[in-house]
Amino acid sequence: MIGTRALSSVTVEQKEDGNGVNVTTQNISYCTSGMYRNALITAGIKNADVKVAGPFKISGTAALVGVMKAYEEMTGKKIPEKSKDAATDELITTGEVAENIGSDDAEKLIADVKQKVAEDNLSSPSEIKQAIEESAKDLNINLSDTDREKIQSLMDKISGLDLNVSQLTSQAKDLYDKLGGSQGIFDKIAAFFQSIFSWLSNLFS
């Protein structure tokens, strides 16, 4: 859950187009830089360098609210409440899923499913469920039923935000470049045998 006491300090610096969202942390024990970044992009934040620091080791969950408020004050633009709500839910869900599959895999999985939902305008429970299964398979991640339900609930919210896919991927370019280049192991095997089959077909044709 999001902390009720904000012990962290946050700074947000507006950067030029193409910079993306970059987050650095200090004395934050629960939320990773990637978790913050993914959630902030969902909120609509773009081209900003963000620093989150604690006076000692703290979870850092309450800092997300502070970053969004600082961004609003810096740009003079109000972030819609439903975007804030989805971003907060994303941070919580990613953290909870990370407890079972690790932070790196949780960040990649949530980002990949989010891209599918936004890119294909997925909204029905069955479509979102299929997207979750496909992403988990591609990334070779085993999910518990509980984590599937949490991600499903999050994506239900995200599907109503009308996210801009190009903005989504450009603000975390390094992450989405990795995801774009990652195929599931079975896909790689299938592609390998397909290439062998094509070579043999050409050889004997």
Please place each PLM-identified region on the residue numbering.
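Signal peptide-directed extracytoplasmic domains
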Residues: 1-47
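Short, Lys/Arg-enriched charge-dense amphipathic segments
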Residues: 8-14, 70-82, 99-112, 146-154, ...
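N-terminal secretory signal sequences
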Residues: 8-10, 33-42, 81, 122-127, ...
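Detector for Asparagine
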Residues: 19-22, 27, 38, 47, ...
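Residues that form generic nucleotide/phosphate-binding pockets
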Residues: 39, 116, 154-157
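Soluble oligomerization/assembly scaffold segments of membrane-associated complexes
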Residues: 41-141
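Extracytoplasmic/luminal low-complexity segments enriched in Pro/Gly and acidic/polar residues
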Residues: 125, 129, 138-205
